[in-house]
Structure formats: structure tokens, C-alpha cells
Amino acid sequence: MNADHHLQQQQQQRQQHQQQQHQQQQHQHQHQQQQHTILQNVSNTNNIGSDSLASQPFNTTTVSSNKDDVMVNSGARELPMPLHQQQYIYPYYQYTSNNSNNNNVTAGNNMSASPIVHNNSNNSNNSNISASDYTVANNSTSNNNNNNNNNNNNNNNIHPNQFTAAANMNSNAAAAAYYSFPTANMPIPQQDQQYMFNPASYISHYYSAVNSNNNGNNAANNGSNNSSHSAPAPAPGPPHHHHHHSNTHNNLNNGGAVNTNNAPQHHPTIITDQFQFQLQQNPSPNLNLNINPAQPLHLPPGWKINTMPQPRPTTAPNHPPAPVPSSNPVASNLVPAPSSDHKYIHQCQFCEKSFKRKSWLKRHLLSHSQQRHFLCPWCLSRQKRKDNLLQHMKLKHTNYLLDELKKNNIIFNYNNSSSSNNNNDNNNNNNSNSASGSGGAGAAAAAATAPENEDGNGYDTNIKTLINDGVLNKDDVKRVLNNLIVSHNK
């Protein structure tokens, strides 16, 4: 009886354990469904207006300078991040100020500190209004001259459609308000990817912000449309962001004057659904002084390319200091170009190294990636950069490379090498005797065949020495190596 009772207890315990596991799995599945609800609603662009990118296919051939960065351009979308990470978003944003309507400059400045990205052109043309603003943004611009009807929600820095959606707890509209579509190539730095978190939590954060500060939201809305109107403090963000930069706040209407603003600058961020979205950084409210006018305007300062500021010219004691040029309202993110003797202008934001050329910086940025995309065809090891793989193949697999060169009918001109003759006297003497015994044909055979060591392996010197000695042609070696890399890295 005791044994039967014990067996029954064990069976009951196993059944209870299985039921608990089944319940946990159901809870996890429900939680995941809830987390993705907002993303799925946003991906349905039928409810939020036309999306010029919705019909564009994924493009997996475009290679970012850093595979851990997220690249999206107007004609392609990529998925460099694993699917299980696509439920995350980046928390910080900037407002893209593009105010062509002078009557709405104050409203633009009020929203310039908003942590949400919008692309509101503030004109009658709806083509420049992003999916995040769709209809409400255009409707709000018609009421900018009416102080009582302006719903820009300055105290919370939340756009009208976001404020309405949050007040009504409309998750579909609220989620749509947080999504904006990119217009330029701007990769997200890898160092900012640790600050991703769930969009549902993000929107809930602004629900709380609206509910706690909904009294007097429109009390100070657009009191006067003048250049002295200052932007309110941005809405509180997560406390774990540690990137603090020294910024300047540029008011578009005060003649280009720059005011000091000690608020931390947060990088633009992306929101992910089944694809990654890249948002533009605001060039106007946050003026970055480390910008090179030579670089294209669509490249965001402080992201990939940091340029070193121009050193101030030294002045004589009897002469007043040279005036600092004021910023241009049209191109407020430009500063004078570095002097001609300042060669290293492209600076890496991760390790502070500087480079003469932008292409060199892009190649260097791959070294900061954790991904290794270049496969060695011989040992199957992986390298972060192509030049590292080329170096690896030449140094670690010299014999394999020599064999591959022979297969491609590459001529080895050992007769032109002095050091190779000194290092391999016996082999070269044998080759010379065979060449003299058979005339010109023997000489050609000796030039086309690599001498072997006693163990039967190929020529034991490295490829660089062979190229320097004139045994191998540098272009032939490069061509064979590139063909190997391409064939094994498709």
C-alpha cells in the first residue's frame, strides 16, 4: 500500500509540474503577443496614411560600414539585427525642424525639444509629412495663430496626435505617432544599441507623462511668435542613458545666435517592426561644433563621422581677437572648414582615432564590430575586415596560396630574385642545371615552377618577400585572393 501511495504521489507531482510548465508557456506566449501588438498595428499603413517605403523590398546586399549598425535608405531596408531583437526600439529622438512657415516658428521651437521625431514641414504640402504625423500634424498647423486652439502640448513636448492618443489610451494611434520613416542613410552607432527597450513600455511612459501633467498644457502655448521664445525642457527619458554631450541650442529666428544648453544630447534612434527604421537627427536645435562642411549634409554629426574643429588662429597682443563667425540659419550645422595643414579630420567616435580619408574611417569602424563576415576558404576562420583576411591568407597559408597561384597559371620569376637564390641555394642550383641542359624551354620551366624544400612543401618565404623580390606580381596575387574571397563569401 505504501508503495502504491508513493507512486500515486509521484504521478500527481509530475502532473502538477507539467501543468505549471504549460501555464508558464501560455503566459509567456500571451506576453509576447501583447508586446508585439503595437508593432503589428503600426505595420498596417492603411490606417496611418501612405508610406513611400512600404512597397520597397528588403535589400540584403547593401553592406553597412559596421554590420552592427542599422542602415535604412529610401530605397531599401535591411535586417542586420536578429529577429528576436526586433521587438526593441531606441528611446531617444530629436525633432526635425523644417519650418518654412514663419508664423509657426514658435511652435517649431516648442516641439524642437520633443523626444519624438516628426517630419512636419508646416506647409500645405502633405508630401513631406511622415507617417508619424499623417493627418493630425497638418491639421495642427492651421491653428498656429490661435493661441487657445494650439494643441502642441508644450509642457510635455508631445505632438498633438500623440497627446490625443495617450489621453484616449488609443494604442494604435499612439504607436503610429512614434513611428517615422527615414529619408537618408544614417547608421545607428553600436554603442547606443544597449539602450533599446520595449515600445509598449515607451508609450506607457508617455501615457504617464500626459496623465501627470495634463493641467495647464496649453497655458503657455505660443504666447508670442518672436525669436526670444525658448524651447521647454524635454520630457523625462529613462535614467540609464549615460551619453552626455556639451550642446548648443540654435534658435532659428534670432539671426543665428547660439545659446548654451547643458541638456544631454541623445542620439536619434530607430523603431523596429519586421524591419528597422532609421530616424534623422535634428541638425538645428542641437548644434554640433565638430562638423566638416565638406561632408554631405545628410550625414548626421556625432554618429559616424566626427571631424575635428578648426584651431583658432593666434593673434598678436596689440590686435583684437578674430571674431567667431556666427552660424547660418540656413546651414546651422556648419562651421568653418579645418585648415589645410589639419590633415586628420575624420575621427572615430569609439576610439578617437583620426584619419585623412572618410573611406579609411569606414574601414576602421569595422574593427569595432563584433561580427566577423569574411571567411577564410582554407581554415574557415573569420575576420572582421577584408584586408585582415587578405593578410591572414598571405601570412598563414602561404603554401596554399602558392598552389592556387599555380592553378591560375601565374608565373614565378625566381630568376629575378636574389634573396630567394641565397635562401634556397641547392634548389636553385638544381633548377639552373636543368635549365642549362634543356635550353630556353628549361629556363621557362624553371621560371614557372616554384622550388621546393626538402620536406616537399612549397617555397617557404612569405608572399610579401616574393613580391618585393620580383618573383610574384602584386596584381596577380591580389586578383587571385579576391576571387577566392568572393567565391567563398557569397
Swiss-Prot record:
Low complexity biased stretches: 8-36, 119-128, 138-157, 214-232, 248-264, 421-436
Induction, as annotated: Induced under aerobic conditions and repressed under anaerobic conditions.
Zinc finger (C2H2-type): 346-368, 374-397
Region feature (Disordered): 1-69, 101-162, 214-267, 421-458
Keyword Nucleus: yes
Record's compositionally biased regions (Polar residues): 37-65
Location of region: Prion domain (PrD): 98-295
InterPro entries per UniProt: Znf_C2H2_sf (IPR036236), Znf_C2H2_type (IPR013087)
GO biological process entries: cellular hyperosmotic response; cellular response to osmotic stress; negative regulation of ergosterol biosynthetic process; negative regulation of transcription by RNA polymerase II; positive regulation of transcription by RNA polymerase II; regulation of transcription by RNA polymerase II
Main location group: nucleus
Top-level lineage group: Eukaryota
Entry-linked PANTHER family: CYSTEINE AND GLYCINE-RICH PROTEIN 2 BINDING PROTEIN, IPT_TIG DOMAIN-CONTAINING PROTEIN
This protein's domain notes: The prion domain (PrD) is a Gln/Asn (Q/N)-rich domain, which is unstructured in its native, soluble form, and which forms a parallel in-register beta-sheet in its amyloid form.
Function statement: Transcription factor that affects the expression of a large set of genes. Recognizes and binds to the consensus sequence 5'-[CAT]AGG[TC]A-3' in the promoter region. Plays a major role in the repression of a specific subset of hypoxic genes (e.g. ANB1, DAN1 and HEM13) under aerobic conditions. Acts synergistically with the transcription factor ROX1 to recruit the general repression complex SSN6-TUP1 to the promoter of hypoxic genes. Represses transcription of ergosterol biosynthetic genes. Negatively regulates pheromone-induced gene expression. Can act as a transcriptional activator (e.g.
Name of the protein described by the UniProt record: Transcriptional activator/repressor MOT3
Organism: Saccharomyces cerevisiae (strain ATCC 204508 / S288c) (Baker's yeast)
Gene this protein is translated from: MOT3
